[in-house]
Amino acid sequence: MSSSEVDKVFTEEQEALVVKSWAVMKKNSAELGLKFFLKIFEIAPSAKNLFSYLKDSPIPLEQNPKLKPHAMTVFVMTCESAVQLRKAGKVTVRESNLKRLGAIHFKNGVVNEHFETRFALLETIKEAVPEMWSPEMKNAWGEAYDQLVAAIKSEMKPSST
């Protein structure tokens, strides 16, 4: 493992919990992605300013035509990354995508506080699969999220393109 990767191990049990819950959530990823982002904006209203199409828009967030597709993409990428974590031993977002994500977050002025979306993700998952939710599942998704954030942060620098 390189120094840019998180040294924590994602266990087989954690993987099973993430895979099982993602299998249930996947079919609703558009709605869940939107819920995730609405929770983020509830927790950190200033995060809306990071999105040019939300900044001065009079359209309610949940009706914004650009937010739902973006939210779904982010939610699916986050969950798919979590599912692959143990098998790959690291975050599996393609390196080019990781570099692009890092550069975009850097360019848009995303700071550490903006990554405090962990709670929003965990709450979204908890509400999506209440019958499966447990402290172990919370820890599994939390660990996967932490590793993805660490990978993105390691690429947060100006784009080389």
Curated annotation (Swiss-Prot):
It is an enzyme of class 1 (oxidoreductase). It holds the Pfam family Globin. It comes from Trema tomentosum (Peach-leaf poison-bush). Phytoglobin that reduces nitrite to nitric oxide (NO) under anoxic conditions (e.g. during flooding or in waterlogged soil) and upon root nodulation. Required for general plant development and during nodulation, especially for the onset of symbiosis. Monitors nitric oxide (NO) levels during early phase of the nitrogen-fixing symbiosis and buffers oxygen in functioning nodules. May not function as an oxygen storage or transport protein. Has an unusually high affinity for O(2) through a hexacoordinate heme iron because of a very low dissociation constant. GO terms for molecular function: heme binding; metal ion binding; oxidoreductase activity; oxygen binding. A motif (Homodimerization) lies at residues 42-46, 112-123. Keywords: Cytoplasm, Heme, Iron, Metal-binding, Nucleus, Oxidoreductase. Belongs to the plant globin family. The record marks K138 as: Homodimerization. Its EC number is 1.7.2.-. Disulfide bonds: none annotated. The lineage of its organism: Eukaryota, Viridiplantae, Streptophyta, Embryophyta, Tracheophyta. GO terms for cellular component: cytoplasm; nucleus. It comes from the Eukaryota. This is Anaerobic nitrite reductase GLB1. Binds 1 heme group per subunit. It catalyses: Fe(III)-heme b-[protein] + nitric oxide + H2O = Fe(II)-heme b-[protein] + nitrite + 2 H(+).
